[in-house]
């Protein structure tokens, strides 16, 4: 019998899954094919289960609140007594109770498709529920059931805004179940963080949970076993911030565990020689500004890398006196200048970062949101600050690091939901042992896809976008214009201003009124320009007039580096059976072509039309392959590092 709620022995002080050994390519290949039957078996949803939940719920609907509370307490007792094997009948009872409590508290009862999605999560799978199908509500079935069974549940969201919003929305429902709910907010004190993680159900972004885990690792040192943890809790009287990794449900799981998994999570502190570091960053920037591409260095935009030529190395040797003494040796000065060139040529303001209050703030390329208190590693952040002429912060010393892949595999039970999992199904299985389950839609989609338009010039594209938005807005339809960067949002806004189209902008540079902008985006005739901030977890509610006029129209102005992100943007329209439409208006000057288009991209763009569209599609696929390879390389390096350090003691 498989475990619905697997767990370690009841006496385990810090429950978590054991670290897995690194796998060779041969091991991965063998595992891929020998485990295929198990993958298919776990990916088989049971429609009969949903029917039983709906049927059982009819009896609960007739009960008073007091009697329903008694049923909840009895269900919790039965679930905890069953330990890891609650059985189908107990799960049906729990789902039906949570569904009825949701109806009374939120005015919403789960559909059969939401029940199927939550059941797949309990099976340890990724439930692919189309955008607009109510994943946030569906998660409460799995989270509430696991918490009633005595498991500490972490609901991982794509960003901090969604964590706070969802926790506030669902707190009343969990209270009806006798469960506590909290959200972990960035910048909270250790005491507030510890209190939040003590709740039965915790909503937090993946980065917040992972960095809390790293802080605990640093605090516990080599005492990672139960005895060491108990000893620490006894003597310092505080214990750890994060009481184990038992049960995780990841909302928008492809964003959290695929897109964000290309860079490791690093916990660091400032160094002692900060002033010398700043001097070196300024000197490296000045030298890099004098070097020329082609003669002194070569850019590899595909790998985001810089390679110095022989001439560049010789020229750098002549200029080494400008560097502080400790940075003059060839390997160190060359690395510093390569980083400075990367800051100048490969990292652009209002695309990769913004300047706010004299500080460089990184923009998450997948969510479009600012990542406060985050910095690039290996001196890149200081190089960008030198380029922008702002105060240079100190390069930080690494205390601990881990990849998202290795972190999430430490959860005893892992599952999640997203609207776009199919493209990453193989990676979910090979890295996380998670099959993908496709859940049918509750209502037939009424979203229409219009023909893609392609221009040779970006200026022509923005003029077309503004013209389309003006016409649709005049007809009473709300319009959402999706952009990749802050700079692109400003270009779209300028084109709309030129035609006198009233609109609002939502981007990393203008995020203060996010909730208000989203709330108004579904009004009849509203025009909204947004980066990926409006691409995930955003439900644009249509008013009656907008619905009658034809619903929301989404305009994608650039292909992203992943088809999944494009699908998420398109999914803002036509949700829950609403009318809607989507189209792409692109250009040969879109940033995907120079980054991933290959050597013939500039030649192809001369022909325009279908040739440019084919080149953009090929560039997108190349970007996806590059990112898959980068994530695999990162995981292999992380596993190898963990193995090499294992002789010093248990690394966690």
From Swiss-Prot:
Enzyme class: translocase
The keyword Oxidoreductase belongs to this UniProt entry's keyword annotation: no
Family per similarity comment: Belongs to the SecA family.
Location within or outside the cell: Cell inner membrane; Cytoplasm
Quaternary structure annotation from Swiss-Prot or TrEMBL: Monomer and homodimer. Part of the essential Sec protein translocation apparatus which comprises SecA, SecYEG and auxiliary proteins SecDF-YajC and YidC.
One GO BP: protein import
Membrane topology recorded in Swiss-Prot or TrEMBL: Peripheral membrane protein
Main subcellular location of this protein, as a coarse class: membrane
Entries under Gene3D superfamilies matching the protein: P-loop containing nucleotide triphosphate hydrolases (3.40.50.300), SecA, preprotein cross-linking domain (3.90.1440.10)
Function summary: Part of the Sec protein translocase complex. Interacts with the SecYEG preprotein conducting channel. Has a central role in coupling the hydrolysis of ATP to the transfer of proteins into and across the cell membrane, serving both as a receptor for the preprotein-SecB complex and as an ATP-driven molecular motor driving the stepwise translocation of polypeptide chains across the membrane.
Keyword entries, A-Z: ATP-binding, Cell inner membrane, Cell membrane, Cytoplasm, Membrane, Nucleotide-binding, Protein transport, Translocase, Translocation, Transport
Keyword Membrane belongs to the record: yes
GO molecular function (one): ATP binding
GO CC terms: cytoplasm; plasma membrane
Species name: Ruegeria pomeroyi (strain ATCC 700808 / DSM 15171 / DSS-3)
Binding-site list for ATP: 114, 132-136, 539
EC number: 7.4.2.8
Protein name: Protein translocase subunit SecA 2
Transmembrane portions of the chain: none
